[in-house]
UniProtKB/Swiss-Prot annotation:
Function in brief: Catalyzes the reversible transfer of the terminal phosphate group between ATP and AMP. Plays an important role in cellular energy homeostasis and in adenine nucleotide metabolism.
Domain free text: Consists of three domains, a large central CORE domain and two small peripheral domains, NMPbind and LID, which undergo movements during catalysis. The LID domain closes over the site of phosphoryl transfer upon ATP binding. Assembling and dissambling the active center during each catalytic cycle provides an effective means to prevent ATP hydrolysis.
GO cellular component terms listed in the entry, alphabetical order: cytoplasm
Region of interest (NMP), ranges: 30-59
Sites where the protein binds ATP: 10-15, 127, 178
Protein name stated in the entry: Adenylate kinase
Any GO molecular function: adenylate kinase activity
């Protein structure tokens, strides 16, 4: 099972990926985690990524694509994986398609969690309030203004992936505002049709 979860920040992608990982025993591949691992392992590509990050620059698609390709080849991905935070752009999606094709693989689904942005802001605010009430630490970017900026960035850069994957026939859209259990059940119906 090879899939991509799409949706803006706060849509519940991480929650759903965690449930899928537990149920199906496939890893959740996060771009950030993959970059950190490549740097820590001091692989050739990891050294290139570290040099770019140390210079305060964004890691190029070429480097990210290579790191993803190497990660997909790992034994724990033999039965599938969930991509989280990749691809972020249409060129990355096209590179992923070529990469998988070259390995004799293809995506099983691209699932977009459709959500109402105003409701997401309210959801984020209540999550912050709960964290504070429990005495927990709140991320510096967990405030309405920063969150709205992240939503705008998503809309501008990542949302075009919906059109791209709709065009390939791989996109499945579900209501991400439903309760966690309902969203999970809908994802299962898509992945394991009756």
């Amino acid at each position: 099972m090879r899939l991509i979860l799409l949706g803006p920040p706060g849509a519940g992608k991480g929650t759903q990926a965690g449930l899928l990982t537990k149920k199906h025993g496939i890893p959740q591949l996060s771009t950030g985690d993959m970059l950190r691992a490549a740097v820590a392992q001091q692989s050739e590509i990891g050294k290139r990524a570290k040099a770019v990050m140390d210079a305060g620059q964004l890691v190029s698609d070429e480097i990210v694509n290579q790191i993803v390709s190497e990660r997909i080849d790992a034994p724990d991905c033999a039965n599938g994986f969930i991509l989280d935070g990749y691809p972020r752009t249409v060129p990355q999606a096209q590179a992923l398609s070529q990469m998988l094709s070259g390995k004799g693989l293809k995506l099983d689904a691209v699932i977009e969690l459709k959500v109402d942005e105003n409701a997401l802001v309210k959801r984020m605010e209540s999550r912050v309030a709960e964290t504070i009430a429990k005495g927990g630490q709140v991320r510096s970017d967990d405030n309405p203004e920063a969150f709205r900026k992240r939503l705008v960035e998503y809309r501008e850069k990542t949302a075009p992936l919906s059109s791209y994957y709709a065009g390939t026939g791989e996109l499945r859209v579900i209501n991400g505002m439903a309760p966690v259990e309902e969203v999970a059940a809908e994802i299962e119906r898509i992945l394991v049709p009756a």
